[in-house]
Amino acid sequence: MVSLYGGGSWVNYGWELFEHVIDARAASMGNATTGYYYKSPTSSLINPIFSSRSIRDVSITHQSRFAGIVNSDLVSFQLDRNNHSLQFNFLYEGIGQIPDTRSMLLDWGNDGQFGTNDIGEGNGVLDEGERLDIEKLKYFSQHQFGMHGAFVKSFRTFPFGFGMKILSSVINNHSALGIGFDIGLLKKIRIVDIGLVLRNFPASGLIWDNGSIENSFSSFSIGAHHASNINGIKFFVIHSMINCDIGFSNRHIDSQFKSGSLSIDTSFGFEGIYKDRLFFRLGRNNLSSATGGLGIKWNNYGIDYAFLSLNSVAGLGSHHLISLNFSLDWVLEKLYGSR
C-alpha cells in the first residue's frame, strides 16, 4: 500500500465507474441514497454499511447512453456465511468508436511540402496551408471492469461498512489495474437516518502498464432519509432523501458550489411505495439532471425503470435504465428444483 500511494501523479478522474454505473432504482432517486437502505444488493455501492442487511436477491442492470456509444452493465448479489453478509457488485462499461486523430495532421508547413524545414513544419499545430488526412483517422475503444465487495465490521459495538473495489481499465493498447477502499456508516437520529461515506480512502490508485501510477483524491458524502405516511392513504409510504457530495480535487467544472479545489454538489430524491408492490420515484442528481422512474415487484421478481434527463447545453439527450431483480432462492429452485 505504501508503494502504491507513495509516488505517482494525482489525477481528478479514474474511478467514476463506481459512481455512475448503478441500478435503476437509485438512479431514479438521483443517487441520493447515502442514508436510505432500499433493500437491494446494489445499495452497498453507495454506502457499504447497507451490506449488513441480509437480502437474497440478484439484481441485473443495463444502461446505454449517447446513442449507444457508452454501454454499461451491473450484476449484484449477496452471500451469507457464518452469520456474516458479503455483497458483491460486478460492473462493466464500454465506450466504442473513440476517434484517434493523432496521425491525421499533414504538418508540412507553409509551403505544402515535407522536408523543407520551413516555418510551421513539424510543430504539431494546424497552420495555414496544412490539412488533415481523413484516411489516417483511426478508432479505438475503452473498457472498464470493476468489482466492489462490501461487508460490515463493528468497533466498540458501533458498525462500520467497508467496501473494497478493484478496477481494471483498458484504453486502446494500454491497460491499468487498481484498488480502492470506501468506509460508510449509518446513524438514526430520532426519525431521520443519517448516512456518511468516505470514498477512495486514503486514496485509490491505478498502476498502468508503462509503470505510471495515478492516485485519486478522497471524497466525502453525507445523506439524510426520512420515511412518512400520508393521512387517509393506506399502505402508502413516502421516502424522502437528500445528499451532499464534497470533493477536494476540483474535478467538476460545473459544480453547484466550488471554491478552489473544494466542490459541493447536492442531490435529492423521493420514493412512494404502495403495498410494497408499486414504486413511484422522482429526484435530481448531483449533475443537476432531473430523474424519475417506476418499479413493480412480485413475490419472487421485480423490474425497475429509470429516466435521466441530462442537463447539457450540448444536446446529448437523455437515457434510460432497466433493472431486473430476482429472488436467489427462486432462481435456484427453478434451476435445480426443490430438494
Q: Locations of the language-model features?
A:
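Subset of outer-membrane beta-barrel
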Residues: 4-339
